[in-house]
């Protein structure tokens, strides 16, 4: 899958984030962007949406995650520490 890759530190998920949504959810894969589309309730103000993305994926995956690129963009790269891409896909149900 184009939206996930492996590094020495873990798996990196390529995200496209839509802030100010009705609920936090994974909407699916944006084939054109090659990213996983995620809806987040928090607004893109003062890092609130970024914190919500980290909290959402940490809870879903049960491990520490970190935004490594795209802090001020809708396109973000999220590092899932210590997990392979296969493990991440399984936990996300993809």
UniProtKB/Swiss-Prot annotation:
The record's section on InterPro entries has: DUF167, YggU-like_sf
Task: Cite a GO CC annotation.
Answer: cytoplasm
Where is the signal peptide, in residue numbers? none
**Record Gene3D superfamilies:** YggU-like
NCBIfam families for the chain = DUF167 family protein
Record PANTHER family: UPF0235 PROTEIN C15ORF40 (PTHR13420:SF7)
Q: Which family does it belong to?
A: Belongs to the UPF0235 family.
Q: What is this protein called?
A: UPF0235 protein TON_0641
Its lineage reads: Archaea, Methanobacteriati, Methanobacteriota, Thermococci, Thermococcales
